[in-house]
Amino acid sequence: MSEIKIYRVEGVMLLSHDRFPVWQKFTKEVRALNKEQAIEYVYSVLGSNHKLRRKHIRITKIEEITLSEVRDRRIVALARLERFVKL
């Protein structure tokens, strides 16, 4: 079984592409098995939350980070869990 890694994905997304287009920067920290899954997750989340198509999302940088570099408390809490079910 592969180990889950933490990735920081940075890029820009095009908001209000039809009226007044604005490129907005974003940074997402995600847990994934590899870079491809992390990119797919970012496309999925930004597309569903902001009603964006993939062509309106441009990923500029993706890097694997350690637990001490994570800024999102939810990611840290998930990474520190030993198991999900009580015994």
Swiss-Prot record:
Keyword annotations: Ribonucleoprotein, Ribosomal protein, RNA-binding, rRNA-binding
Coiled coil regions in record: none
NCBIfam families, per the entry: PRK00773.1-1
GO molecular function: large ribosomal subunit rRNA binding; structural constituent of ribosome
UniProt key word Ribosomal protein: yes
GO biological process: translation
Protein name as annotated: Large ribosomal subunit protein eL20
Family: Belongs to the eukaryotic ribosomal protein eL20 family.
Subunit-structure text: Part of the 50S ribosomal subunit. Binds 23S rRNA.
Keyword NAD: no
A cellular component annotation (GO) from this entry: ribosome
